[in-house]
Design a protein with these regions (language model features):
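A conserved ligand/cofactor-binding region detector
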Residues: 1-160
Length: 160
């Protein structure tokens, strides 16, 4: 799809796997997630997201069934059946690139580090928070002291 200004829909990225994570006053992180997770993430309009389909298809397996090989296999078989119908399951894994400011990431944490949030985005937000905190430990002691306040658990444990 093109237009007179040679612009593309910014949601679709390319070569996202080649991008490196960066954490500071601004941040950029890439991770694997599903279409469902990306849809939840897109609700944070203060952050920027891009996605790229993977060459090799894989699917999210809910943690509640992943330890049971029979249930996990049945789940994955169902995902492949849906995919074979030329329908993309919302549980298909994609590469996601998220970027924005530190302040807006903390706003996301306030919304997504909660037991009421969609499981995938809650788990990924926690993982990104811990990675962000670890990176700031050496590079930005002031932000490191701030981000530590948000690393103790769910939203109800935040200082504000």
């Amino acid at each position: 799809m093109g237009n007179d200004k040679n612009r593309n829909l910014s949601l679709f990225g390319s070569n996202l796997g080649d991008k490196k994570n960066y954490f500071g006053d601004l941040y950029e992180v890439k991770y694997d997630g599903t279409y469902a997770e990306l849809a939840q993430a897109q609700r944070h309009r203060t952050l920027d997201y891009q996605m790229e389909r993977k060459k090799d298809k894989s699917y999210f397996v809910p943690p509640i069934i992943e330890s049971d090989p029979a249930l996990a296999t049945e789940w994955l078989t169902d995902m492949m059946k849906i995919s074979n119908l030329n329908v993309t399951p919302i549980g298909e894994m994609i590469t996601i690139r998220e970027s924005g400011s530190y302040q807006n990431f903390i706003l996301k944490c306030k919304e997504r580090l909660c037991s009421n949030a969609q499981l995938e985005i809650m788990l990924q937000t926690r993982k990104t928070l811990l990675e962000y905190m670890d990176a700031l430990k050496e590079s930005n002691p002031v932000l490191y002291e701030d981000i530590k306040k948000y690393s103790h658990g769910a939203r109800c444990s935040f200082p504000d």
